[in-house]
């Protein structure tokens, strides 16, 4: 397939990732998938606990208005986690606050609801967030109405194609009422205070954190600020830093020639048919007839080009 990168790494604990690289022998019990399943359901469990607590203590502790908003925020997060689950695993057990209160998790099976029904439950949570939350929040990272609209558009877009039509190339099976909802919620986002930054590269720089292009983002923290041992950080950034020559470090997500070639363009459009027939790569300061999608230079570190737009860090 196109747009491949190489896993990299050579430790014995990296073998679980090899099936993803060759797209064979993938099972739900291999490390990365099993861990993803566990962590997402752990997050859903926390959401359910929060909903039960809000229902029991919210009005007396927070007041009716704030309780209603916090419930909407938690339901957004639960839907976010379930959206990830259904996208990766498709068949998943629906465990909500009622299942949690009745302690019937082990009796809840992954075939109790159809793909359509699961999406409808996810949509219901996002819809609650859309109906209740304001368009803006004063605290960074708190979800809002526009974030819910974005997810509703994504959900209806997947539902519109229909279940079981993965190999279908026509459009007659598409649900037009769902597609209209995609358009409607997309319009909400398009006419909101969110939008594209003027410079594509800015979205990768820390000074543009929570910019107008960031609709929903996890908020990381330093251990000095949150009283944890290591802080709430993005560990993947640590694994993919730029190390000096002869320096030790990690070696993950190595770009392949195929990935670079996928950024070739012709007349402003991607070269879908023959992009990988002749391997090539751009060289800074040496113009060629081959044109490239500028996103390549934000995706792959290449010799003669600076890392993170700093000339002193030219590779």
Place the predicted regions along the sequence by residue:
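Short, conserved phosphate-binding/catalytic loop or strand-edge motifs used
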Residues: 95-103, 151
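Conserved, well-structured interaction surfaces
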Residues: 10-89, 105-120, 124-140, 271, ...
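Short connector loops/turns at beta-strand edges and beta->alpha or beta->beta junctions
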Residues: 52, 56, 99-101, 158, ...
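Contiguous, well-ordered alpha-helical segments that form the cores/surfaces of helical PPI scaffolds
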Residues: 73, 80, 150-157
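Short acidic (Asp/Glu) and glycine-rich catalytic loops that position anionic groups and cofactors
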Residues: 103-106, 164
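An aromatic- and glycine-enriched ligand-binding surface/loop that stacks and positions planar moieties
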Residues: 1-15, 92, 119, 127-130, ...
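Short, well-structured active-site flanking segments
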Residues: 86-98
């Amino acid at each position: 397939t196109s747009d491949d990168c190489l896993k990299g790494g050579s430790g014995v604990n990296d073998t679980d990732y090899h099936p993803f690289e060759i797209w064979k022998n993938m099972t739900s019990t291999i490390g990365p998938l099993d861990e993803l399943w566990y962590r997402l359901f752990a997050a859903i469990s926390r959401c359910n606990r929060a909903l039960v607590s809000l229902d029991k203590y919210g009005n007396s502790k927070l007041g009716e208005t704030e309780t209603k908003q916090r419930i909407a925020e938690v339901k957004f997060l639960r839907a976010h986690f379930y959206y990830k689950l259904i996208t990766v695993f498709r068949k998943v057990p629906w465990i909500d606050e009622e299942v949690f209160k009745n302690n019937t998790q082990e009796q809840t099976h992954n075939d109790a609801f159809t793909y359509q029904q699961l999406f409808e439950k996810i949509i219901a949570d996002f819809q609650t967030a859309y109906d209740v939350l304001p368009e803006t929040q004063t605290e960074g990272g708190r979800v809002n109405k526009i974030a819910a609209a974005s997810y509703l558009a994504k959900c209806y877009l997947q539902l519109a194609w229909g279940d079981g039509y993965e190999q279908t190339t026509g459009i007659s099976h598409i649900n037009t009422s769902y597609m209209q909802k995609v358009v409607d919620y997309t319009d909400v986002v398009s006419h909101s205070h969110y939008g594209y930054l003027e410079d594509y590269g800015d979205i990768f720089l820390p000074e543009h954190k929570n910019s107008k292009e960031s609709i929903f983002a996890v908020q990381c923290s330093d251990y000095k600020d949150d009283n944890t041992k290591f802080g709430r950080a993005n560990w993947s950034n640590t694994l993919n830093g730029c190390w000096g020559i002869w320096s030790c470090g990690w070696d993950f997500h190595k770009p392949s020639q195929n990935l670079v070639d996928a950024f070739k363009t012709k007349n402003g459009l991607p070269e879908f048919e023959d992009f990988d027939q002749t391997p090539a790569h751009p060289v800074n300061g040496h113009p060629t007839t081959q044109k490239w999608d500028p996103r390549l230079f934000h995706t792959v570190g290449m010799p003669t080009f600076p890392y993170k737009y700093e000339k002193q860090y030219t590779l």
